[in-house]
A protein has these predicted regions:
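A generic structural signal for short, solvent-exposed coil/turn residues
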Residues: 12-14, 92, 197, 208
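Sec-dependent, cleavable N-terminal signal peptides
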Residues: 1-23, 204, 211, 222
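Generic N-terminal leader/processing signal
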Residues: 1, 15, 186, 197, ...
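A short, hydrophobic C-terminal helix/tail in secreted or cell-surface proteins
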Residues: 199-217
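Mature extracellular "passenger" or substrate-interacting domains of secreted, surface-exposed proteins
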Residues: 20-196
Length: 222
């Protein structure tokens, strides 16, 4: 009986500690600047998407329905992020970071690249319920990130599909130490896809080479 009581007391202490660490990230958003091609009539534009919560007008879709043409100057940039943290009375949110990576759709988890980190800056706070809410945002600092860096395009006939993956984390201090709160879609993270073209086909390269030879012959004749 004494042993059972000890176990119950220990369990209640654990439960109390868990309740005391209820602080969380309750909103997270990302800004993406898209220019599918510099030769089309559509200019580059930045859209902010909700990853979690309701900070922006649009939620991140499963697909951006976008094909970026790098041969025509197309680009895809991470250009900002926003977030909100809620902290219990004894806790204090120290930071908020957005983590991101890009990989070819279908790549096994073990083969995917490591995450990059995008630091959000503290902006302001309020306490409507007696507990502090903090707002975090970054645009000009740390600046933009080229999400296409190192990616290999597909061809015009067969574009390659890539997946963008995001999650957020915040370090929370409390009297007994610190812990990290995550916003990661229940462990699945937040994802969307896009397509990337073109890597010139062999036929295109051959045509380009023949055009160059013909131009060279014309110059020699002149």
């Amino acid at each position: 009986m004494k042993k059972l009581m000890s176990l119950l007391v220990f369990a209640s202490l654990l439960a109390g500690k868990s309740t005391g660490q209820a602080s969380a990230i309750y909103a997270l958003g990302v800004g993406l600047t898209v220019d599918a091609s510099t030769v089309d009539a559509v200019a580059a534009a930045t859209t902010y998407y909700n990853l979690d919560g309701n900070t922006h007008a649009v939620s991140l879709p499963g697909s951006l329905s976008l094909t970026v043409n790098t041969a025509q100057g197309g680009s895809l940039l991470l250009s900002g992020a926003t977030g909100k943290t809620w902290q219990a009375p004894a806790d204090n949110a120290q930071n908020l970071n957005l983590f991101y990576r890009v990989f070819e759709t279908g790549t096994p988890t073990a083969s995917r690249p490591s995450f990059g980190s995008y630091n959000l800056l503290y902006q302001n706070q309020w306490n409507p319920d007696g507990n502090i809410n903090k707002y975090w945002e970054s645009t000009s600092a740390p600046g933009t990130v080229n999400l296409l860096a190192g990616l290999v395009p597909g061809t015009l006939a067969t574009p390659k599909s890539y997946t963008l993956e995001f999650y957020g984390s915040s370090v929370m201090n409390y009297s007994g130490g610190s812990f990290t709160a995550y916003d990661n879609n229940g462990g699945n993270n937040f994802t969307t896809t896009f397509q990337l073209v073109p890597e010139p086909s062999s036929a295109s390269l051959l045509t380009f080479a023949l055009s160059g030879l013909l131009a060279l012959r014309r110059r020699r004749k002149v």
